[in-house]
């Protein structure tokens, strides 16, 4: 983490979780003036059993009081709906699988929240992300966290130079175990709080039930890769490539015992295509094309580019060659076949520890 002048004001996005809490503590103990910001991105009934916002706010208030910093609650639900949620609905409706966290970071946390922090007099916005920022001659680089298991650079690959220049990741150099140990030692009530998982606006409720509230499902056929109809689906928007659960087509007398997996979605015919076996060849591909390209540095890399890539956040880095097709499309050729490459997800590129940027798989 860079050293700033001691009189600088740094705003911290306090989520109520342990990571942002320790991030605020680290800054406070370094002598900075710290203010906390709690985002409300989703309007919900306070009695909603699946929404944790009320408890999260309570935890954030307790941590702010514990550390001795002010906490401001800011509502970005309208911006979130317009710039994140509506985009996700459009993607689901077209049979793709979007990643809301990627868009939320670019449009809400490091745009709306950063702007609000500036209005309050803060010079920078800090978050509890596991990633690092390096300033190299006034060009900012996004680097992986020291904790490879918790690294979140994948979700931050759409950030630009202005956003990185005005952001701080105080725990990027820590291990998650260290963060929890610090929180426990300091008596934080959330030191053992579980990490948030899944899509933030859905919470722990069933994905299918939630999506049904906003999109009209169109049931259709489930077919094998040979075109044989073997079942019915509830709507292809509910499924993603590589999915096994929820197909309800197992135990067929005319098929083996191997489980079925979604291999493709034919949106035009409203057909879900499946194959049997985790290692089925059709689940693997050695290439993809991507669009909506974003490069973190001001100048994009030279092509063809030999680098590493991820097509999902927890995946090990995969060697590939990236070739420019046109202004907004690249072809990615992997050294080894990749399982369950999914349209709508992000492919993110790395050189060593540096996140270069990425695009949307199409």
From Swiss-Prot:
Residues 99-101 are annotated as: Interaction with target base in tRNA. Residues 150-152 are annotated as: Interaction with tRNA. One of its GO terms (cellular component) is cytoplasm. Keywords: ATP-binding, Cytoplasm, Disulfide bond, Nucleotide-binding, RNA-binding, Transferase, tRNA processing, tRNA-binding. It is an enzyme of class 2 (transferase). The record marks 129, 345 as: Interaction with tRNA. Catalyzes the 2-thiolation of uridine at the wobble position (U34) of tRNA, leading to the formation of s(2)U34. Belongs to the MnmA/TRMU family. This is tRNA-specific 2-thiouridylase MnmA.
């Amino acid at each position: 983490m860079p050293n700033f002048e001691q009189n600088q004001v740094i705003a911290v996005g306090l989520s109520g979780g342990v990571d942002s809490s320790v991030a605020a503590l680290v800054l406070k103990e370094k002598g900075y003036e710290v203010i906390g910001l709690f985002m409300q991105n989703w309007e919900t009934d306070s009695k909603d059993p699946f929404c944790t916002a009320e408890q999260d706010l309570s935890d954030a208030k307790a941590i702010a009081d514990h550390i001795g910093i002010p906490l401001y609650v800011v509502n970005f639900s309208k911006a979130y709906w317009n710039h994140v949620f509506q985009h996700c609905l459009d993607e689901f409706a077209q049979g793709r699988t979007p990643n809301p966290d990627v868009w939320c970071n670019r449009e809400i946390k490091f745009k709306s929240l950063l702007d609000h922090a500036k209005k309050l007099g803060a010079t920078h916005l800090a978050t509890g992300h596991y990633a690092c920022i390096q300033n190299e001659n006034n060009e900012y680089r996004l680097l992986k966290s020291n904790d490879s298991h918790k690294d979140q650079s994948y979700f931050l690959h759409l950030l630009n130079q202005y956003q990185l220049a005005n952001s701080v990741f105080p725990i990027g150099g820590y291990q998650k175990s260290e963060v929890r140990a610090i929180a426990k030692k300091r008596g934080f009530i959330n030191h053992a709080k579980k990490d948030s998982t899944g899509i933030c606006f859905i919470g722990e409720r069933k994905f299918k039930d939630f999506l049904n509230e906003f999109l009209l499902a169109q049931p259709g056929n489930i077919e094998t890769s040979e075109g044989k109809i073997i079942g019915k689906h509830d709507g292809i928007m509910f499924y993603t490539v590589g999915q096994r659960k929820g197909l309800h087509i197992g135990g067929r007398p005319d098929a083996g015992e191997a489980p079925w997996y979604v291999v493709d979605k034919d949106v035009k015919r409203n057909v879900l295509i499946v194959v049997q076996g985790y290692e089925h060849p059709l689940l693997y591909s050695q290439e993809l094309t991507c669009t909506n390209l974003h490069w973190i540095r001001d100048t994009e890399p030279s092509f063809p580019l030999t680098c590493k890539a991820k097509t999902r956040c927890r995946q090990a880095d995969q060697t590939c060659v990236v070739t420019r097709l046109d202004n907004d499309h690249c072809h990615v050729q992997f050294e080894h076949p990749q399982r369950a490459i999914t349209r709508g997800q992000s492919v993110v590129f790395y050189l060593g520890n540096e996140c270069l940027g990425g695009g949307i798989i199409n």
